[in-house]
């Protein structure tokens, strides 16, 4: 029985930068068609490997990944009748070289599949949509797309999604029906049915309800989720208590009326069908020194995830490290937002109008070491270079130091010495 939860991170610039603007193909008084082309390529190196899938040996690995997304979007406005919108696009993805440091991918995965295929209608206070599309709730603590892209390394390739494990070109839920109501300010909410075709997630179906109050000082939100079905054969191996699970959360994020202040927090309660209760929560505070050159910012966050907590579809939402905590830990070594408490400190500043630099520090402490010891510390240094409106570059260097090797209850193969990790991502959008 595989009890560990695993995920992979979105490249920061694809998730956060505005460079992926579509190219207009036709624009009339009421109708617009646009072409969407965006992608990423990455070079990766890890001095050490991690024993998650049984296909890795101790030592260094080098690999490459690439994704390309391409398709069309449209909007049609009718006076007094709202707007019809939709999209159809594909994603091609590939992994090369050794495959990633944990063996989720082995380096020979290639595939092209439909990514988004949805249709919807909206007016000023209501939106209805359905089809295959990405969904994010809050800042991604619970749901940030269906973005787990396992390759052929796990379960003899049974859950292969086509490679590019880190770049996660595939984020859309396979089937959705979504009703959104409310405005940008005051009360708003969502009613959603989501169906995943991701075998590494055991293909769950989810019913989701959210309620938020949005104001200038911040947003307060409630979320309720029920997992109504799973692929039972895979769920018995990966998530035996996922079907029937209920999850409730309360969250808040804002500046409390102080422009340089950042405050955020969320608490999630999870009830497993067998009666077990799990939980996860975090508190975060940050400050931007807006009067200083480069407007440096500093953030501290404490998060805790109980030993049996199922993190569902978490992912990077508002920033690098939220919620993939540590480039090595979140992608390859664990603890994957379960059975851990984490201290996190992040700093970031602008070197110029096109270049930002930052540092992310993490201290991981395992709650129940009988399930595996993922105690570790990690430091990641990164830069974001916006080359122009279409191209960006993200280099990152990380240092990861576990307390235990895999042979002593950890996950790093062969040694508990510190490991150096490096990556360079090239991201583009037209």
Residue ranges of model-derived segments:
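Outer-membrane beta-barrel translocator domains and adjoining extracellular loop/strand segments
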Residues: 46-56, 97-104, 110, 140-147, ...
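Outer membrane beta-barrel
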Residues: 66-198, 203-222, 282, 287-316
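Beta-barrel outer-membrane channel/assembly domains of diderm bacteria
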Residues: 21-131, 135, 177-184, 254-257, ...
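Surface-exposed beta-loop-beta
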Residues: 207-292
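Cleavable N-terminal export/targeting peptides
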Residues: 1-28
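Short secondary-structure boundary/capping elements
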Residues: 111, 171, 203, 243-247, ...
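Transmembrane beta-strand segments that form the barrel wall of outer-membrane beta-barrel proteins
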Residues: 161-162, 188-197, 220-228, 261-271, ...
């Amino acid at each position: 029985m595989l009890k560990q939860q695993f995920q992979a991170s979105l490249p920061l610039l694809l998730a956060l930068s505005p460079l992926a603007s579509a190219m207009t193909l036709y624009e009339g008084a009421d109708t617009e068609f646009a072409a969407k082309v965006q992608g990423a390529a990455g070079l990766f190196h890890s001095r050490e490997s991690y024993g998650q899938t049984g296909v890795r040996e101790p030592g260094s690995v080098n690999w490459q990944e690439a994704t390309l997304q391409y398709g069309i979007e449209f909007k049609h406005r009718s006076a007094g009748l709202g707007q019809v919108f939709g999209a159809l696009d594909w994603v091609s993805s590939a992994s090369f070289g050794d495959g990633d440091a944990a063996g989720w991918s082995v380096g020979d995965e290639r595939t092209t599949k439909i990514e988004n295929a949805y249709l919807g209608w909206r007016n000023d206070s209501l939106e209805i949509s359905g089809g295959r599309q990405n969904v994010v709730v809050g800042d991604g603590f619970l749901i940030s797309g269906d973005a787990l892209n396992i390759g052929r390394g796990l379960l003899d390739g049974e859950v292969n999604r086509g490679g590019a494990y880190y770049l996660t070109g595939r984020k859309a839920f396979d089937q959705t029906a979504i009703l959104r109501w409310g405005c940008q300010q005051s009360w708003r909410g969502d009613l959603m049915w989501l169906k995943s075709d991701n075998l590494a997630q055991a293909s769950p179906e989810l019913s989701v309800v959210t309620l938020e109050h949005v104001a200038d000082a911040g947003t307060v939100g409630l979320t309720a989720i029920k997992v109504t079905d799973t692929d039972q054969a895979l769920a018995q191996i990966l998530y035996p208590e996922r079907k029937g699970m209920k999850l409730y959360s309360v969250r808040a994020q804002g500046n409390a009326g102080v422009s340089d202040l950042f405050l955020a927090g969320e608490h999630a309660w999870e009830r497993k069908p067998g009666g077990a209760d799990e939980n996860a929560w975090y508190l975060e505070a940050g400050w931007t020194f807006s009067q200083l050159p480069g407007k440096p910012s500093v953030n501290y966050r404490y998060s805790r995830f109980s030993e049996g907590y199922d993190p569902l579809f978490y992912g990077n939402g508002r920033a690098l490290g939220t919620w993939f905590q540590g480039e090595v830990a979140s992608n390859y070594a664990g603890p994957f937002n379960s059975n851990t408490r984490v201290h996190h400190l992040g700093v970031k500043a602008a070197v110029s109008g096109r270049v930002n630099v930052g540092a992310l520090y993490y201290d991981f402490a395992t709650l129940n070491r009988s399930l595996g010891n993922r105690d570790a510390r990690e430091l990641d240094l990164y830069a974001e270079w916006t080359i122009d409106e279409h191209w960006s570059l993200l280099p990152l260097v990380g240092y990861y130091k576990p307390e235990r090797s895999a042979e002593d209850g950890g996950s790093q193969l062969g040694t508990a010495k510190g490991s150096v990790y490096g990556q360079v991502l090239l991201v583009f959008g037209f």
